Curated annotation (Swiss-Prot):
The record marks H172, E224 as: Could be important to modulate the pK values of the two catalytic cysteine residues. This is Diaminopimelate epimerase. Its EC number is 5.1.1.7. One of its GO terms (biological process) is lysine biosynthetic process via diaminopimelate. Transmembrane segments: none annotated. Catalyzes the stereoinversion of LL-2,6-diaminopimelate (L,L-DAP) to meso-diaminopimelate (meso-DAP), a precursor of L-lysine and an essential component of the bacterial peptidoglycan. Belongs to the diaminopimelate epimerase family. The gene is dapF. The active site is at C82 (proton donor), C233 (proton acceptor).
Length: 329
């Protein structure tokens, strides 16, 4: 039996158990064991309430970063990137090392992270880099008959909606819709199909429906690959912000307010001299509780769990967001 200590965290109410592999002396765990533990602990019927996944934090394989993040979804699958999760990992590592900015290694890139000005209500807020950004079909992968899909109708997916596809680096399929389409079952039907065996996105894809709220604000709802509908998806909010900026020819560096069922974040973008795009995701990094579980081959049992006051702070922001969104329906 192993005793595993955790921090329950969330970014935009996209919730996770953060597990420090070095602190728990589990750096030798196999990927299969990490997946099994995630499936058991993240079960929504578990006494701890489950989660969308586990953020495994360990030493970086490179010299520069202060740590490495590995994301395992609640179904045991691996996510190449998670923007909401990265904000909480950024906070954990920056506080651990008494820093305000640093680099963190993810599966596909080494990314800049730093502490940011609070979004309000004294909510701990962090800024993380989202990159690399690619549009080519192979990066997703995607098979819809074009090398780059940007604001284009794909009859095989939907007869009316115009889609854009981008990897950041996990794959995203994005369309801008009105409230009527949001209220329909079209998103769930399409996303469920594209995340089962299909010829268009063989590895599945995150599917986001986006509603414009104003020149500097959008609402995003995402069906996440390996998870389903969640309160928010950080990389999706980043990807949708980029597509909005490109469609509307917005200034990349101007912050875009992104609303979702989990709260609100801000996203900026920049393009370097080589033409490469990177995104900056700014949002909460809330520590909900700390605790421990016992892990045996067939069960994960709660041992301790102590709540922090941070969730109450975040709920003030959620209340504000819900009141605002009511005015946009």
């Amino acid at each position: 039996m192993a005793t595993i200590h955790f921090t329950k965290v969330h970014g935009s109410q996209n919730d996770f158990f953060l597990v420090d592999e070095e602190g728990n002396q589990i750096m030798d765990w196999s990927d299969a064991k990490r997946a099994d533990f995630a499936i058991k602990l993240c079960d929504r019927e578990h006494s701890l309430g489950g989660a969308d996944g586990i953020l495994y934090v360990t030493k970086s394989s490179e010299a520069g970063p202060i740590g490495q993040m590995r994301v395992v979804n609640s179904d045991g699958s691996i996510a190449s990137m998670c923007g909401n999760g990265l904000r909480t990992v950024a906070r954990y590592l920056l506080e651990k090392h008494a820093l305000t900015e640093a680099k963190v290694e993810t599966m596909k890139a080494i990314l800049d992270v730093k502490k940011a000005t609070s979004l309000g209500f004294d909510i701990p807020t962090y800024q993380v880099e989202i990159s690399p950004v690619k549009f080519n079909a192979e990066s997703l992968p995607m098979n819809v008959g074009v090398e780059k899909l940007f604001n284009q109708v794909v009859p095989e997916l939907d007869a009316e909606l115009a889609f854009s596809a981008v990897s950041v680096p996990n794959p995203h399929l994005i369309t801008f819709v009105d409230q009527t389409v949001l209220d329909s079952d079209r998103q769930e039907t399409l996303a469920s199909y594209l995340n089962s065996e299909n010829p268009y996105f063989p590895d599945g894809v995150n599917v986001s429906f986006v509603k414009r709220l104003s020149d500097d604000a959008i609402y995003v709802r995402t069906f996440e690959r390996g998870v389903g509908f969640t309160n928010a998806c950080g990389t999706a909010m980043s990807a949708c912000s980029l597509i909005k900026k490109m469609l509307d020819k917005d200034t990349f560096e101007t912050p875009l307010n992104v609303y979702n069922d989990g709260g609100r974040v801000q996203v900026t973008a920049k393009k370097d001299e080589a033409g490469d795009i990177s995104l900056q995701l700014i949002g909460n990094a809330t520590f909900v509780s700390t605790g421990s579980v016992s892990y045996e081959s067939d069960t994960v049992t709660e041992l301790t769990n102590e709540a922090t006051p941070e969730q109450a702070q975040y709920q003030e922001l959620v209340k504000e967001v819900k009141e605002f969104l009511k005015t946009t329906e």
